[in-house]
Amino acid sequence: MANELARMRPAAVPPATGSVDQALAHAARLMARQPAAALAQAREILHAVPGHPHALLIEGQALRMLGRLDEACAVLRGLVASQPRAAAAAAELGLTMAAMDRSEEAVAELRRAVLLKPEFSHAWQALAVLLRAKGDNAGAAHADIAGVDASSREPALLRTAVAVREGRLDEAEAQLRARLAALPADPATLRLLGEVRWRQGDIGDAVPLLRAAVARAPAFAAARELLARILSMGPDVGEALDHASRLLADDPENGGHAMLKASLLVRIGDQKGALAIYRSILERDPGRPRVWLNLGHVEKTIGNQAAAIEAYRRAAALDPANGEAWWSLANLKTVKLERADIAAMRAALPHDAVGDDRAEDVAQLHFALGKAYEDLSRDDPSAAESAFAHYARGNALRRSMLDYDPARTDSAVDQNIALFTPEFFEARAGWGCQAADPIFVVGLPRSGSTLVEQILASHSQIEGTMELPDMMLIADRLQARVDEGEFPDLPSLLAALGPDECRRLGEEYLERTRVHRKTDRPRFVDKMPNNWQHVGLIRMILPNATVIDARRHPLGCCFSGWKQYFARGQVFSYDLSEIGHYYAAYVRQMAAFDSALPGAVHRVIYEEMVADTLGQVRALLDAVGVPFEENCLAFWRNRRAVRTASSEQVRQPIYTDALEQWKRFELWLGPLRAALGPLLERYPEPV
């Protein structure tokens, strides 16, 4: 509004123009925090220069902010009459009318303001609020967008946007915070500052800023979309889905909004809803490989293998260098790639150094080629060397992208072993949330955990969900308190938790996971293998939960994990020595937990499950505390959605083929054997 004020001139200007301008600027600065002082300053100027329009505007605004609305209205009506081309005067009169609940007059004045000055963002924003209150959602949406567009075109904000694009985030943050101090409700500023804080790694600060932007301008799609995407990275998936649904309702033909909503439906387990969206997009535009790929993922999850294969092949045909499409096809496990597929993948490999923009695609191409040659090696043992070579290249490339230090795992295990003693748990008997709903399945990836989950989910009292991140998110939040200096280390924090906080954390976990529960079954499975690191925390906050440790022969488990390209996480798995070291750390911690709380964890040995399925299933159900049901032996008939790498394998009866796959590659597994050490001789003993 300051630039608009500068255009307003009095009929006669006294000689001391500079001093008047300085006084006006001082009055404007006082307005936000001291409107009474601003009013006094404006009236001093008007005493010296009667009728000065800038001073009259400040007087009217100050009177409005002080709640003296009739006086403000009288001043501003006179100003508008004398300055009919002054957008700032019309806007201020509109705001005053709005404060007096005279909405029709307020809308008329604000419309006049933006007609006089289309780039008047503040007036557009005020108009949007009034129109929305009147039920004119279309008009409000237009005003939202016009206001954001006007604000975004201001030179200062454009310069800040350039700083953001160039990665000068601290500089941009300082500029945006200064701007926000002057314009605390400006949606464009709020959105850009939210983006900066997100890119700086502070999601906790970014989300409120973006929520404020959306609250101020509900039709601001860019702010709502960024908010939804950031929320989707954490536990607030339900809110993210609400925003995505609003985006798609406002713009039904927007493919990006449709993709966002579909991805969130997948997150909450609504595979059919996601399927409908992907198919709808492809009906309109079948030439989109990314959509075919996502469709394949959903078809695979719900067990439509033929449809998944077709979708993955369509994605690969449209984009032959798309490593994710080829790996997704290979990762079906039950599909064998043909020699023509091998030729197509080899042709897609780069002939020179791999750039960062292609690294993931190339890594996945190598993993897919490894799987293709491994399948050939069943009939042609010489293909094993090519398979291992491609797996090794893919792993090396993937490992180069990741930050993982095995020493951190060892340190965490040492701390857990020292903290979680029999005395520790005895002193906390009866603490935590007493609900017995969750069944945690822990272990390493590729250990048979999906098989255990599928068996349990075939029981009439147990619901299968997915790999839930919620316990890890709770642990991460506790770790953040350590990182902020509240405690010297995580064991100190855990030891300091009292009974009420333990109970609240357990209740929080149940509340977080509620979105994934689609039935009224009393128990549910949380199959997140890496929760073995948090078994002590689980016992503290949910002492009646069941913990199942799914374990497989170390060579079979680790080699299978090493040749798996994971969509996210599992950073320890891309080096044979590191995955062996990780397995040993896991065994060491679980053995210590067995000693601290004998019988608290039920262990399922994969090889024993294969050899004696009936006996092992009975023991598993006994550990969970539910009666035996025949359905659990026919788990492959369960059509529930399964999102893990073993999704196709658990849709068939137990088979023995996977038990010794590693033996064809034994020649190259020296680093893994060395890392595992004496565990190889002791398996399946827990220590």
Give, region by region, the residue ranges found by the protein language model.
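Structural marker of alpha-solenoid helical repeat scaffolds
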Residues: 48, 82, 116, 148-150, ...
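PAPS-dependent sulfotransferase catalytic domain
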Residues: 302, 307, 314-316, 465, ...
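Register position in tetratricopeptide repeats
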Residues: 32, 65, 99, 133, ...
